[in-house]
């Protein structure tokens, strides 16, 4: 895993990152309690791998780590503004962490910190935290993990635990469980969306070993073999096209080869379908029309819809995504 520490935070972003770090330290040191679904639980009760909370507090041994993931990290490195942060937690669900965050912001401990005084000085009219929304896991709407959402200091934050996914048979919806940063990074769509900002070390983490390279060289690449990434969720095929057209990036040759592969060994398509043919079928049969349509709409309403159409044509997906126009 490679890392860099040259990201430039705004003052407000610095407040958010310091706050997330402080909450993790506070939970480890104090073992606070919160009410979850009508029952009171301590941090140790809820935290996966909480045996470390039996030990005296040490900043290097916090059990719950917080990382900002995905689009915000990518956009910061590209010098683009972003006010939506996805926070990944190592050992609490998103909703549990959000409840502890709210409890910390309302505690005497926080009110006495330097951070609280700086926030009061520079952001006097911003509420510390808004209402916490809980979005339950809902496979019907492609929400595979429970997520919490709230507004903190003017930023929209989504909280979810690091995850790994196991897909079974023809079902697109995976079985989910807690994972490592590597598990989580490798399950994402493309490498430039798989970067993390570790709020405890103030550094970018590149667990795929390709994200920073691909960001600097303008490459759309999947963390895993393209066939594996696309089989897990075929909609990622269209996302690759969209991000390529949005940023002017080149689609990696492995993706092009995967999507344009023909039937092997001279066999007929019916008896020996190629990977590309299987992926086209999966995109049509495993992805809802709603998700499909949203992705196509984002392509065509983006900054370079012509490039998106060129890319779709290059991988023979135009008729699949725009049948009415093509006919």
Model-found features: residue ranges?
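Catalytic cores of the polymerase beta-like nucleotidyltransferase superfamily
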Residues: 1-322, 327
């Amino acid at each position: 895993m490679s890392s860099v520490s040259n990201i430039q935070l705004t003052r407000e972003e610095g407040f958010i990152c310091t706050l997330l770090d402080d909450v993790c330290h506070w939970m480890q040191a104090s073992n606070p309690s919160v009410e979850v679904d009508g029952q009171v639980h301590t941090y140790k009760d809820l935290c996966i791998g909480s045996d470390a909370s039996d030990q005296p507090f040490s900043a290097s041994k916090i059990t719950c780590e917080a990382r900002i993931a995905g689009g915000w990290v990518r956009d910061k490195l590209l010098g683009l503004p972003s006010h939506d942060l996805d926070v990944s937690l190592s050992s609490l669900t998103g909703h549990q962490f959000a409840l502890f965050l709210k409890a910390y912001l309302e505690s005497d401990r926080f009110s006495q910190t330097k951070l609280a005084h700086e926030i009061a000085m520079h952001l006097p009219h911003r509420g510390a935290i808004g209402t916490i929304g809980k979005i339950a896991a809902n496979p019907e709407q492609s929400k595979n993990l429970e997520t919490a959402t709230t507004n903190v200091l003017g930023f929209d934050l989504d909280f979810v635990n690091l995850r790994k996914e196991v897909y079974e048979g023809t079902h697109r919806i995976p079985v989910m469980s807690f994972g490592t940063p590597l598990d989580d990074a490798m399950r994402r769509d493309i490498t430039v969306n798989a970067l993390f900002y570790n709020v405890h070390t103030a550094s970018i983490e590149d667990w795929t070993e390709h994200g920073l390279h691909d960001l600097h060289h303008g490459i759309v690449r999947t963390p895993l073999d393209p066939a594996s990434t696309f089989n897990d969720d075929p909609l990622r095929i269209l996302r690759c096209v969209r991000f390529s057209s949005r940023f002017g990036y080149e689609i990696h040759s492995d993706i092009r080869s995967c999507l344009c592969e023909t039937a092997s060994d001279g066999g007929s398509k019916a008896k020996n379908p190629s990977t590309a043919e299987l992926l086209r079928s999966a995109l049509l049969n495993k992805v809802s029309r709603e998700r499909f349509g949203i992705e196509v709409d984002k392509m065509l309403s983006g900054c370079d819809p012509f490039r998106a159409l060129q890319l779709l044509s290059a991988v023979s997906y135009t008729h699949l995504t725009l049948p009415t126009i093509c006919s």
